[in-house]
């Protein structure tokens, strides 16, 4: 099997899943991921916010979704399609912040890679993020992440340099996001808020129960319209 074909089999969200071995490997990795996910169950009471300065929509928006996520967090991968659906449905920004947890061995690098793809186009960077989440169960080491990233770049006709961040600028941006999350008071991933500007209601509401995400957005939009 050629190197490129082997990579295609390894990342099922990029290519059709084939072979019994892949199913068995996925089942084993799912068990590991499920165990890891238990570390990140959000508290029912939500986050005690210490610094709310970042919990506001970007310029020009009245309502937005703000998320702090880790690329190895299984619950972040589960939340991603819903957040994208909500942002598209309501035509509001999805503001993603990196919060790579210290116990994970490749999430920081994935965050740096995503920011490098952002330098080519924001759409490409977001597509990389989405594909990392979609293939998360197959990316079980830094070496596999590197192979995944090489294939993603090749599939999108982008020349991937030997070092994507030789000066450490992108890594510094990821660290700044993590420090911001610490200042806010984040203790788990994903942490998600619906935030508003010029609203008579709460300026930000944490989405503790994701089944209520659309309801919270509806309320935020109604609050901004009533002013």
Residue spans for each PLM region:
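N-terminal secretory signal peptides that target proteins for export/translocation
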Residues: 1-16
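Short, flexible loop segments at the rims of nucleotide/cofactor-binding pockets, characterized by
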Residues: 43-44, 72, 169-170
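A short beta-strand-turn-helix
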Residues: 44-63
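Boundary at the C-terminal end of the N-terminal hydrophobic targeting segment
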Residues: 34-40
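Bacterial N-terminal signal peptides
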Residues: 19-32
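Extracellular/periplasmic catalytic domains that process cell-envelope and extracellular macromolecules
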Residues: 57-60, 87-89, 106, 183-188
